[in-house]
Amino acid sequence: AGINDWGGVSPLTPDHVNPEAPWPHLDKLSKDTEKAGKTLAERLTIYPDYIREGDWVDSKFITPILELVDAEYLPKMDSWTPGEIVEPPLSVLQQIRDRASPLNQNIKDIFEKVDEGQLLNEHEVVSLFEARGSNFSAVCDKANELRKTVNGEEVSFVINRNINYTNVCYFKCQFCAFSKGKLSENLRGKPYDLEHDEIGRRVAEAWQRGATEVCMQGGIHPQYTGQTYIDIVKTVKDEVPEMHVHAFSPLEIWQGAETLGITLEEFLQDLKKAGLDTLPGTAAEVLDDEVRAVICPDKINTSQWLSVMRAAHQVGFSTTATIMYGHVEQPVNWARHLIRVRDLQIE
């Protein structure tokens, strides 16, 4: 009939509405709810939709409330948050390791679709992200099973050095270590812009210590042009011709081409001739303009990010893709991000 909330259920207070027939123990209620294809999840006294909209909540309470909830605006069951250097709680890690079968028919149907090699739609990907309890364990187990099929059990690594050539940036996103200004100087240090000789020295030092790759990115310096990025690549190859250069996000590629007045393909060809080997898929944040309008409104949009990567593939580059989660986004935004990356791979 559409019910999605058990009214009056509380582990803290008795059932004052119907004291003669109190609510069953939460464990039993949880199991009965799960058998019906639903998941029992605690909520705050504020419904998730009201937290999501934000305008309903007084501004001084928004941050404290958001610190209490997960991406679905339901209460977190532990104090762990994304971005911390500690591992998630053991209870979560155990759920990931458990080999459970999904109880939710919708999850079962999605698994069947995956086994048949069909592409999942946005709603189905969101359903996987929103899985809880044994359904969550089943999704993790299924993902691990697919990983084994696609990649096997061998794990490789590369000895790499990150070289950030500048932390000066004219974009205004506040989450980035390259964002400089009065509000960030005490947290991120003084502005710097490495000379090419210093970049070369760091490349040589990395090679001497066993590195075979350098990853180079930085802020979008107002004085940088596309030629700056070309010269940085040449600096690396002049110092150590064998060094693999993994550098420049789609944002830097977009800005570089724009400053030189050439197409993305032409600029990427110039970088390739200079010695660029692969491109990192950073500056993606979340590939959904609904989120980007909040966290990075002045950066390239989703379509522009994808167009850079599409051009890179056409030129012959291999690329990666990143996602930055744990801020204002929701599972639907993760789903859109992954689907857009998947569709670009298929192209």
Spans of features found by a protein language model:
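Conserved C-terminal portion of the radical SAM core fold
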Residues: A1-D15, D32, T39-R43, V240, ...
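Auxiliary Fe-S-binding modules of radical SAM enzymes
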Residues: A1-S134, K148-V150, R201, W207, ...
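Active-site-proximal loop/turn and secondary-structure-junction residues that shape catalytic pockets
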Residues: P11-T13, L44-P48, R161-I163, I220-P222, ...
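Glycine-rich, proline-tolerant flexible connector loops at the mouths of alpha/beta enzymes
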Residues: T13-P19, R161, K180-L183, L187, ...
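Generic structural signal for well-ordered alpha-helices
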Residues: L26-S30, G200-V203, I230-K234, E265-L268, ...
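N-terminal pre-triad scaffold of radical SAM enzymes
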Residues: A138-L183, P191-Q217
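Radical SAM/AdoMet-radical enzyme domain recognition
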Residues: C173, T212-E213, G226, I230-I323
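Active-site loop-helix segments enriched in His/Asp/Glu that coordinate
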Residues: N186-G200, H221-D238
